Amino acid sequence: MYQDLLDKKKTLAVIGLGYVGLPIALEFAKKIKVIGFDINAERVDMMRRGIDPSQELGPEAFENCDIEFTNDIDVLKKACFYIVAVPTPVDEHNVPDLVPVQRASETIGKVLKKGDYVVFESTVYPGCTEEDCVPIIEKISGLKRSEEHT
């Protein structure tokens, strides 16, 4: 898969284009084909114009990048490697809000194919990926981890 990514025969997707996801997507896009996915259409439109909504990156960060910004879930079907970089805010009691990673898991479950890879970059507590995210992905995709996706 690594060589196919470098040869641009396969595509990587980054889910969540905030202050963590966008720089990751842009850095990968300097070498491989990338889909940058965010649920916020206004943010996606800004990034298509080379503007970082968080104002952390300048327009030069978008130059010479092979990236397609989208909020269309169907575009994600072109990817074979997914990186989840959605926020995981905590409340006043330091309890994490898992809704963003759960929704990202639902999104991936709708497009995941046999042999695809999923990486969670989002900061979550130990066991969260296995206990909360993987079951959602498996239920929606109909695939089983390690047998049909990793």
Where are these regions (language model features)?
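Serine/threonine-rich low-complexity intrinsically disordered regions
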Residues: 1-2, 52, 113, 129
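Conserved N-terminal Rossmann-fold NAD(P) cofactor-binding segment
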Residues: 2-11, 33-35, 39-81, 87-95, ...
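Glycine-rich Rossmann-fold phosphate-binding loop(s) that bind the pyrophosphate
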Residues: 17
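N-terminal Rossmann-fold NAD(P) dinucleotide-binding loop
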Residues: 21-22
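Aromatic pocket-lining residues of Rossmann-like dinucleotide-binding sites
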Residues: 27-28
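Rossmann-like NAD(P)(H) cofactor-binding subdomain of soluble oxidoreductases
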Residues: 90-148
